[in-house]
Swiss-Prot record:
This is Flavin-dependent thymidylate synthase. Pathway: Pyrimidine metabolism; dTTP biosynthesis. The active site is at 173 (involved in ionization of n3 of dump, leading to its activation). Belongs to the thymidylate synthase ThyX family. Transmembrane segments: none annotated. FAD binds at residues 56, 80-82, 88, 162-164, 168. Catalyzes the reductive methylation of 2'-deoxyuridine-5'-monophosphate (dUMP) to 2'-deoxythymidine-5'-monophosphate (dTMP) while utilizing 5,10-methylenetetrahydrofolate (mTHF) as the methyl donor, and NADPH and FADH(2) as the reductant. PROSITE patterns: THYX (PS51331). One of its GO terms (molecular function) is thymidylate synthase (FAD) activity. The gene is thyX. A motif (ThyX motif) lies at residues 80-90. Residues 2-207 form the ThyX domain. InterPro entries: Thymidylate_synthase_ThyX, Thymidylate_synthase_ThyX_sf. Its EC number is 2.1.1.148.
Amino acid sequence: MVRVTLVNYTRRPLETITWAALVSYWDEWSTESFEKINEDDVKAHLPRILGYGHESILEHATFTFSIEGCSRVCTHQLVRHRIASYTQQSQRYIVLNEENVEETFVIPESIKKDRELYEKWKKAMAETIKLYKESLKRGIHQEDARFILPQAVRSKIVVTMNLRELKHFFGLRLCERAQWEIREVAWKMLEEIAKREELRPIIKWAKLGPRCIQLGYCPERELMPPGCFKRTRERWMKLLEKPL
């Protein structure tokens, strides 16, 4: 099971974004005016400014997540989003100690459905762990012993993105056509934001969702799975059930 946690974010993020936006055209703007920005100011200005497509202001708010238990297949996709900061568990310094195959590796459900194949996978992965540990016992350094480990090995990573990049990330990775594991991570990240009462409005105003939510239509119509727009929209709307 992948665990995603929003561990930190910009203090008063909506007020910060609004305050930054107002510097462009508010004569009374000052450093001190930040503390005067309130919820009414946010509601009065932020939806309108974002509605114009002026999204650079979103870069003034950042969010830091911890992601635990995903595979290196997933983290390799994650770090392709280059306007972000990443720090990942190192196989050079951390020794793989788990004996349980399920706790050590991510095994896709498609493999588990084929019982015979699943048993072969577990056997192969158990042999991988055995050979990895034998290499360490023979004096092979961790930085070399890790070469035997597959991409399925579970990892941990800390991710920091500004809100504009987070919107771009969600647009691509919440889509049903995204690979299943990173899609699961992306939904958990969005759900973590939705848990915070002060953050939930930005999901609606900035349209933090897959591209079909952001655009109002699917840009990959010919490729989309049947019914995915309806399913995705319903799941997204559930995050907004409480009044904004």
